[in-house]
Amino acid sequence: FDVFTKNGEIYGFPFRGDYYVMYYNKDIFDAAGVAYPSNDWTWADFEETAKKLTSGEGANKIYGAAFHTWQACIQNWGVQDGKHTIMDYDTGYDFFKPYYEMALRMQDEGTVQDYGTLKTGNIHYSGPFAQGTVGMMPMGTWLMSVMIQKVKDGESNVNWGIATLPHAEGVEAGYTVGSMTPLAINAASAKQDAAWELVKFITGEEGAASYAKNGAIPGRSNADSIAEIAKMEGMPEDAAEALTVKNISLDRPITDKVGEVNQMLGEEHSLIMLGELSVDEGLAEMAERAAEIVG
């Protein structure tokens, strides 16, 4: 509730939570003779393994990994340790730098598909992974239900697994990035009492159980709800361990001007990934523009 509290007032109750994990294609790992990811991988492990998984050329190429085009799929790793947020522009956003360097390095080496191709093709975030053309992809827990349904409907035959999100050296395993979705009551509502009963139900234990049975992580998450999700038909083995995390840093803090800053970070992200700005130039522009936005 602290996330949705300001000046002592609660402005919303969390009913759903999502966070990033790492999806992987077991068949691609098996074909390369590489052991499946553990729940204590570093980003260096991720990058090195992507090289081992990459194979083929042209239309038959298998990419070792994938980063979707959202800026979150690079910038989130900079706030994963909980020490910074996207509003910490006074640092010059230096905490993003290692991850931009990693992504560009992998792009140059051909172990991930290049940003420009994904962007111009307007490729859905689930596309490359569901098609079986990438070995690993960091993505939110919302993809679990998507993959279950795609496999069930025959749209995908990927033999997939999940692992806890990789972390930086010196950061404890189980640290990830995510967000909470709140429910709130309109102050102008003529049915405040009825709305409150609905909010209590959805954000309470019964609502949490219902969300878990449908593969969504409830705001009121605990070992029981994780176990419920993990035993769903179509979920990979050992999912419960991968989903048991120690800390979830917010991808976007709830504060003034965060929406405008986030939009700006997306614009600069594209310029860096397309090579129109160097990493240092892009980070400097981010910091300068964020300071102007916040005022």
Question: Which residues does each predicted region cover?
Answer:
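Hinge/lid segment of periplasmic solute-binding proteins
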Residues: 1-19, 159-163, 231-234
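Extracytoplasmic/periplasmic substrate-recognition and gating elements
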Residues: 32, 109-112, 150-217, 277
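A local structural motif
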Residues: 33-38, 104-120, 133, 153-159
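Pocket-flanking alpha-helical
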Residues: 1-12, 23, 47-59, 73-78, ...
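Alpha-to-beta junction loops
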Residues: 131-139
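Long, aromatic- and glycine/proline-rich binding clefts that accommodate carbohydrate-like moieties
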Residues: 163, 213-267, 271
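Short helix-initiation/N-cap motifs at beta->coil->alpha
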Residues: 41-47, 116-131
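Glycine-centered hinge/linker elements that transmit conformational signals in sensory
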Residues: 50, 88-119, 165
